[in-house]
């Protein structure tokens, strides 16, 4: 079962990305290192509710 998730920057809190994940394979919150346009650098983005 795939669900839509929103990824927010851990430094500024801005929600920059929308993605999908499989809840069966990844039951915990996912984290990706992605580019944040507000900070102008790659930062850690964490799944939000």
Curated annotation (Swiss-Prot):
Protein name, UniProt field: Large ribosomal subunit protein bL33A
Superkingdom, natural source: Bacteria
Entries under PROSITE patterns matching the protein: RIBOSOMAL_L33
Gene3D superfamilies per record: Ribosomal protein L33
Secreted in keyword set: no
A Gene Ontology cellular-component term: ribosome
Keyword Lipid biosynthesis: no
Organism: Bacillus subtilis (strain 168)
Pfam families for the chain: Ribosomal_L33 (PF00471)
Record keywords, A-Z: Ribonucleoprotein, Ribosomal protein
Biological processes annotated in GO: translation
Entry's Gene Ontology molecular function annotations: structural constituent of ribosome
Any coiled-coil regions, as ranges: none
Family: Belongs to the bacterial ribosomal protein bL33 family.
Region (Disordered): 20-49
Segments of skewed composition (Basic and acidic residues): 25-49
Subunit structure: Part of the 50S ribosomal subunit. Interacts with VmlR.
InterPro entries in the record: Ribosomal_bL33, Ribosomal_bL33_CS, Ribosomal_bL33_sf, Ribosomal_zn-bd
